[in-house]
Amino acid sequence: MDAFSSFFDSQPGSRSWSYDSLKNFRQISPAVQNHLKRVYLTLCCALVASAFGAYLHVLWNIGGILTTIGCIGTMIWLLSCPPYEHQKRLSLLFVSAVLEGASVGPLIKVAIDVDPSILITAFVGTAIAFVCFSAAAMLARRREYLYLGGLLSSGLSMLMWLQFASSIFGGSASIFKFELYFGLLIFVGYMVVDTQEIIEKAHLGDMDYVKHSLTLFTDFVAVFVRILIIMLKNSADKEEKKKKRRN
C-alpha cells in the first residue's frame, strides 16, 4: 500500500525537476550517504575485477559455461554468508565479478575483433545511463519508484519465459530484437528501483554494502551486455548494407 500511495502522491506537481528537487538529497542522512559511498566504491572495484576477468578470457579463452556456473555459485555462497563475515563476503564478490567478466569475455572479444570503439562506447553509455538513473532515484522522493518493482518482476519473468521458449522452439530475428530492447528497458528500470530500495533499506538500518554492491553490479552488467549486443548488431547491419551497395 505504501508503494501505491507514494505513486499517487507523486503525480504532477511533485515530479518537476527544479532547485527544490535537489533538496531531496537532504532526506538522505549522513550515515546513509556514507553507506552509498561504500556501495559505489565497492561497485567500482567489482567492475575493475570484472574487466580483469574479461582480460583473462582474451588471453587464455577461459570464459564459458563453467565460469557462468561458478559465478552463480559464488553469488549464492555470498548471499548465504552472514553479514559479519565481512572479508569473506567481499572476497566472494570480487571472485564472482572476475568470473562474470570471464563469462562475458567471448562477447567482448567479438567486439574487440569487430571494432574496439564499440566496446568503449557501450561501456561509457552504460556508465552514463547508470549515473543518470541512479541520480534520478536519489533526487526523487523516498519510495517514489518502488511501486515499479512488481511491474519489473513481471517483465523479467516474461523475458525469461521468452528466452526459454526461444531456446526450445527456436526464435526469429524480430523476437530476438524484442528480447534485447525489452530486457534493456527492464534492467534500466531496475537501476532506479534497486537504488531507491538500497537507500530505503539503509534508512531502516540495513548497511550491508557488499550485498547492495552485488545488486547494482548485476544491473550494470545486464545493461552493458544488452547495449553491446545492440551496437554489434547495428554494426553488422551497416556492413551488410555496404556490401549490398557495392554488389
From Swiss-Prot:
Q: Could you tell me the membrane topology recorded for this protein?
A: Multi-pass membrane protein
Keyword Cell membrane listed? The answer is: no
InterPro entries membership: Bax_inhbtr1_CS, Bax_inhibitor_1-related
Q: What happens when the gene is disrupted?
A: No visible phenotype under normal growth conditions. Accelerated methyl jasmonate-induced leaf senescence. Enhanced sensitivity to water stress, heat shock, toxin, tunicamycin and pathogens.
Q: One biological process GO term for this chain? A: response to water deprivation
One Pfam family from the UniProt entry? Bax1-I
- Distribution of this protein across tissues and organs: Expressed in root tips, root vasculature, flower tissues, including stamens and sepals, and in the base of siliques. Not detected in mature leaves.
Q: What induces it?
A: Up-regulated by water stress, heat-shock, mycotoxin and pathogens.
Keyword field = Acetylation, Apoptosis, Endoplasmic reticulum, Membrane, Transmembrane, Transmembrane helix
Lineage: superkingdom: Eukaryota
- TM ranges are 58-78, 92-112, 118-138, 145-165, 173-193, 212-232
Q: Mainly localized where?
A: endoplasmic reticulum
Q: What are its GO cellular component terms?
A: cytoplasm; endoplasmic reticulum; endoplasmic reticulum membrane; nuclear envelope
Family matches, as PROSITE patterns:
BI1 (PS01243)
- The answer, when asked if Glycoprotein is one of the entry's keywords, is no
Q: Where in the cell is it found?
A: Endoplasmic reticulum membrane
Q: List residues modified as N-acetylmethionine.
A: M1
Q: What biological function has been recorded for the protein in this entry?
A: Suppressor of apoptosis. Modulator of endoplasmic reticulum stress-mediated programmed cell death. Involved in methyl jasmonate-induced leaf senescence through regulating cytoplasmic calcium level.
Quaternary structure? Interacts (via C-terminus) with calmodulin, CYTB5-B and CYTB5-D. Interacts indirectly with FAH1 via CYTB5-D.
Concerning PANTHER family, the annotation shows: BAX INHIBITOR 1, BAX INHIBITOR-RELATED
Which family does the record claim for this protein?
Belongs to the BI1 family.
Question: What name does the UniProt record give this protein?
Answer: Bax inhibitor 1
| Organism per entry | Arabidopsis thaliana (Mouse-ear cress)
* Phylogenetic classification of the source organism: Eukaryota, Viridiplantae, Streptophyta, Embryophyta, Tracheophyta
Name the gene that codes for it: BI-1
